[in-house]
Amino acid sequence: MLGINYTATFGKSMMSDRRLMYVNPNHGDATDNGNTGENPEQPFLTVAAALARTRDNRGDVIFVGQNDAWTYGGGSTWQTAIAEEVTITTEGVSIIGTNPGGLGVYWNPVTAAGAGTCITVHAMDVLISGFAFEGGAEGGTGIYALWDGATMFGENMIVRDCYFDSDMDIGIQLNFSWNCEISGCNFQECDSVGIYCDTADSGADYNRIHHNIFHDCGAGGIGAISFQGCSENHIWANSIFNGSAQGGGAATDEGIDTAGGGDNQVFDNYFSCANAGVGAGDYDDLNSASGTDAWIANHVMTGLAITNPA
């Protein structure tokens, strides 16, 4: 009998009617009018059209075709990026960019003045993988998972192998989003913050954030990971470079900030700063902790930091 082990090993769905759908705005036969999206030679034009055909908890998957829309892309064809702002309300859906390498399938926000969000998640158990959020109407947010205030929760989300560049103000924002996992992502100079929970929102708890790169996110702004007021998160094995801290300049709370929360475990992260006791730009300046957190063996330029940042 093929059961759970087969499903976990080979990624096969136990739901016989799982829909596999394809989106590719660069394909000559792509259209949202008449195609079902289930034939890769007759894909949808937009992600929104594919989402409209998804069903709760059936394991539906949307594959988004690669494009050559990067600034230095060498081709003259297939250069149309995904340029949409979509809201996911289907539980258990996966959206996967199919770039075989590089930064991911390029996805641009479209709302001007930094007000757009590429993907809003109002559903549980969503997987997002393989996208590069950049370009388009600069600013805005790459992914925002949140409770809708009623019955739809952006919980249990997985984001992996995505890229967020300096065109984005916020990489990923969580609001009352628990049990999410963010891994293998690259946050390159996001203007305001890499991963964020606004103190005016409900806390983001029980999340797992690991093996990500943050390079000068929120320089002079919020920072790499701002989880003020959030609790019981595990944050480990992240690489955080801050140019001001590296040079001995002030970088207050621009690393990891869990102040006001509690019971977070933060360990084995790498910071471009000196250990505590130096002053501007040191471990205590770059980071903030709750008194009930456990910060364990984090790496700084002068060795190991073995206490909670003050």
Question: Where are the regions that the model predicts?
Answer:
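Right-handed parallel beta-helix/beta-solenoid
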Residues: 1-49, 68-69, 300
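Residue-level signal for alpha-helix termini/capping positions
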Residues: 52-56, 187, 200
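Right-handed parallel beta-helix/beta-spiral solenoid domain characteristic of secreted/periplasmic
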Residues: 29, 71-79, 89-142, 161
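Glycine-rich beta-solenoid repeat tracts in large extracellular/virion proteins
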Residues: 77, 84-88, 103-105, 117-122, ...
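Glycine-rich repeat segments that build the extracellular carbohydrate-interaction surface of secreted
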Residues: 21-27, 45-78, 93-100
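Beta-strand-rich, repetitive solenoid scaffolds
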Residues: 3-4, 44, 53, 97, ...
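Acidic glycine-/aspartate-rich tracts in secreted/extracellular proteins
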Residues: 26-32, 67-70, 99-102, 218, ...
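Right-handed parallel beta-helix
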Residues: 92, 96-97, 124-135, 153-166, ...
